[in-house]
Design a protein with these regions (language model features):
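Generic transmembrane alpha-helix signature in multi-pass membrane proteins
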Residues: 22-30, 87-93, 104-105, 112-129
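Membrane interface segments of multi-pass transport proteins and intramembrane proteases
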Residues: 60-70, 91-102, 161-162
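C-terminal ends of transmembrane helices
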Residues: 22-37, 83-97, 153-162
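Helix-coil boundary and interhelical linker segments in multi-pass alpha-helical membrane proteins
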Residues: 1-5, 58-70, 118-136
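Structural signature of hydrophobic alpha-helical transmembrane segments
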Residues: 3-18, 66-79, 136-149
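A generic, lipid-embedded transmembrane alpha helix
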Residues: 43-60, 110-115
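Cytoplasmic-side transmembrane-helix entry/capping segments in multi-pass membrane proteins
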Residues: 36-47, 69-75, 97-109
C-alpha cells in the first residue's frame, strides 16, 4: 500500500511531467486558455498515458535485452497508434472536445510527457516499475499530474487576462 501511494504522490507532485521535468510544454501552453479545454486535454493525455504504459510494458517484455536499442522508436509507434484510436473515439463521441483540442490532439503522439512516462517506467528499478500494475498506475498518476498542472495554469491565465 505504501508503494502504491508513493507512486501516485511522486507522479503527481514530485515527478510532475510539466512542473518538474518540463515535458509536454507545447500542448500545455497551447490548450490552457480555457479550463474545460485544459481539462479535456488533461483527461486525453491521462488516458493515453495509461494505455501507453500498459502497451509499452508488454512491448518491453517482447523486446527484451536483445532489441533494447529499438525501445524508443517502438514506444513512439505504440503511442501514435493509441492516439489515433483516441482521436477517432473523440471525433465520434465528443465532437465539441475534438474541435476544441484541434491540432493539439494529434500532437499527443509527440508529447514528451507520454513518451517520458513510458521511458521512466522502463528504466525504473527492474524495468517498468517492477510490474504491470505499478507502471500503469504511474502512467495514470502522471497524467493526473499533467491535468492538475494544465488546469491550474488555465485558471491562473484566465484570472490574469481579466
Amino acid at each position: 500500500m505504501e508503494a502504491i501511494l508513493g507512486i501516485i504522490l511522486s507522479a503527481i507532485l514530485t515527478e510532475n511531467f510539466i512542473l518538474v521535468k518540463f515535458y509536454g510544454i507545447c500542448p500545455f501552453m497551447g490548450v490552457s486558455k480555457k479550463i474545460d479545454t485544459a481539462l479535456g486535454m488533461g483527461m486525453a493525455v491521462t488516458f493515453v498515458m495509461a494505455l501507453a504504459s500498459a502497451a509499452c510494458y508488454a512491448v518491453n517484455l517482447l523486446l527484451g535485452e536483445t532489441y533494447a536499442y529499438m525501445q524508443t522508436v517502438v514506444f513512439i509507434l505504440v503511442i501514435a497508434s493509441i492516439v489515433q484510436v483516441v482521436e477517432m473515439f473523440l471525433k465520434k463521441s465528443v465532437p465539441s472536445l475534438y474541435q476544441a483540442l484541434g491540432i493539439y490532439l494529434p500532437l499527443i503522439t509527440t508529447n514528451c510527457a507520454v513518451l517520458g512516462a513510458a521511458l521512466v517506467n522502463a528504466q525504473a528499478g527492474d524495468g517498468f516499475r517492477a510490474g504491470f500494475l505499478p507502471s500503469v498506475l504511474f502512467g495514470v498518476a502522471g497524467g493526473l499530474g499533467f491535468t492538475l498542472a494544465i488546469v491550474l495554469f488555465a485558471s491562473v491565465r484566465i484570472r490574469v487576462d481579466k
